[in-house]
């Protein structure tokens, strides 16, 4: 029979196997009306660098689902691709240019920058895709997409123009989130709010022509330079007399009115709020309602502009310091309180964002959000776990219009052209040569690009060739499941849903499988700053892709963060070793090319393993249907390690080493059948090792990845016999425990007595004598119906079907053992005395470190338990 290498070394076969799969075209499904499609689109990794452990988890989960469905006979399509990642990539490229040439963005033309950006994209896209291949990802590489390639660009242009024509995209002056570092607008979803310990400054605003003043509380005194009113609640008795009066804006001298607006919370601060419509979204709404002027006091780099008077040119924080000082000097600062509040930060560079009045492009969200909410509420799209549905619905129920323009160069340029002569804006699917109104050729395109997530939102259908009516769209759309992290539910998941409903009139996927973050062994998020990140390729290089995949998925529950450690990696590598060695044993004992399973004359152990395997098939399939991939992996681990390797292989040895050719033929067929089909169950999780072993087994078909997924078989259900085998195995475990407790050498045989009450149990142990003698080191197995026949000097253990007893003289030299135990007791007593002496010493307990004191307490507990055990053993031996 064929053999595999003596030791498991994934480097010897992983690349070879992946090339074999690629050559055979197994990853590229054909459109087959006879087959059901199963489709996943990859969350496209950003072309900003390399894959991290989160990508490895995300893609392992997807590959498990795709490989499983492929084996079930589906036309399984996994579409790969990458994302241009506007802000992140532009920052990286500009950093590289600055390092190499000393030039900043201001020194470059758009074309010069884009040339370098495309070079970057090509380099890192190739690297990312090769890393996905290293992981074993069975994507259809013939359909690889990029969010800025020609087909995707056509889709983006079509969506923008279509939404513009429907009045769902507009350009307007609104408060947006501005990142002074990235120098671009951000959508609300791109702002991360962090708790910040700041202050509340209480400032006096004098009433014009009176001695009175109004006190307002603010966390941002620098924005008072842009105040145009002070608002109070119309029902607030404290200020009703001031409504309509004029205040003098401190430091600036501008006259501003006191207005009444129900937005004001009378219980916050003083109940009077400064209104700065150009620098606060809520103030903006008040400004619109009351027809107030908009005074912008900040430049795009977060310095004060010409509207800030003497503070012009100062950074926002410098201005704050100076303004507070000036207010204090003029007696207008009443008090300062510490105050904890949430401050928005740029999700890319962590700079504090600035709410800024700016002319930008927006998507009108209310008409798009309603149907997106409806499909989830109706259960047409299900979140796994269900709890993440709340994040989705909460975001859509409170959604604001989406700011989609970015002041960047890398991205989809907004397809809007401005006429220099008549001022008309032409929005067009094709690049226009003249103004559509006046015919002037004096037109120029909008300088801004679209938010990265705009093109990503079209991913489920743009990857299949939309807006063309392609065969792929007809057959593979909608997709089946989206696998992604919980951190981009609103960034990406929600947007794909509303865009798909708008343009495909259908949901983009049926399930959203959410996974958590991969954290380090201490539970910390992996990051460059902490230096605790582990490169997936490093793990693959040391241990192989299968070990990494299995480490990431075993025990992993949907939606939960997982801890990654080298210790877990070692466990998975040991599992692969165990499987490899067990497979070698099977291969060395098989007959050439016999793929039959012989069900006549099955031994008890054969029936047990076939029943257990059969149940595992049902359980694993059920787990995968429910997206319980971590549970499935754990069950496979236990089945392979404990039941197949530790039990069945050991139970098979007496048969294979016997002269009974018929029994050998049957057991060999069971070994091959269970191994073959267990490899199939394991294949989605550990594709390389399973393929390598399977190719060496007698098999039919080209590859395990297109072999049929195992099905539950009624003819392999031997539940009653399996229960009998479990009883025999329980007895073997009990005998092994007795031998271990008595320190008996593995080579020493001992008589075993099994006392039973029921005749059925007597028959079971009679039939299992051979197994007990071989696996428990028994010289003889005596089955008794009367417990009185058990010698007094025997070690015993109760099991479900009776009592196991091993006479002590069979195990040990009684006198020698008594002597050894008495010596051990003396040592233990000395340790107890030492620990008690320390713990009774008040000085030690008070002055020694808590850690040291606790260690002594634990030692005392341990030695006390040891003493009890020794004395029980001595009592038994002396009785």
Curated annotation (Swiss-Prot):
Q: What is its EC number?
A: 6.1.1.9
GO annotation, cellular component aspect: cytosol
List the ranges annotated as motif 'KMSKS' region. 525-529
* Principal location: cytoplasm
Q: In this entry, which stretches build a coiled coil?
A: 804-879
Q: Which residues bind ATP?
A: 528
GO terms, molecular function: aminoacyl-tRNA deacylase activity; ATP binding; valine-tRNA ligase activity
Q: Where does the protein end up?
A: Cytoplasm
- From which domain of life does this come? Bacteria
The record's listing under Pfam families reads: Anticodon_1, tRNA-synt_1, Val_tRNA-synt_C
Which reaction is catalysed here?
Answer: tRNA(Val) + L-valine + ATP = L-valyl-tRNA(Val) + AMP + diphosphate
Residues forming the motif 'HIGH' region are: 45-55
> What does the record list as GO biological process?
valyl-tRNA aminoacylation
Classification via InterPro entries? aa-tRNA-synth_I_CS, aa-tRNA-synth_Ia, Anticodon_Ia_Val, M/V/L/I-tRNA-synth_anticd-bd, Rossmann-like_a/b/a_fold, tRNA-bd_arm, tRNAsynth_Ia_anticodon-bd, Val-tRNA_synth_C_sf
* Entry keywords, A to Z: Aminoacyl-tRNA synthetase, ATP-binding, Coiled coil, Cytoplasm, Ligase, Nucleotide-binding, Protein biosynthesis
Q: What does this protein do?
A: Catalyzes the attachment of valine to tRNA(Val). As ValRS can inadvertently accommodate and process structurally similar amino acids such as threonine, to avoid such errors, it has a 'posttransfer' editing activity that hydrolyzes mischarged Thr-tRNA(Val) in a tRNA-dependent manner.
Q: Describe the family membership recorded for this protein in Swiss-Prot or TrEMBL.
A: Belongs to the class-I aminoacyl-tRNA synthetase family. ValS type 1 subfamily.
Q: What is known of its domains?
A: ValRS has two distinct active sites: one for aminoacylation and one for editing. The misactivated threonine is translocated from the active site to the editing site.
Q: How does it assemble?
A: Monomer.
Recorded hits in HAMAP family, A to Z, give: Val_tRNA_synth_type1
Protein name as it appears in the record = Valine--tRNA ligase
Q: Species name for this entry?
A: Caldanaerobacter subterraneus subsp. tengcongensis (strain DSM 15242 / JCM 11007 / NBRC 100824 / MB4)
Q: Which gene encodes it?
A: valS
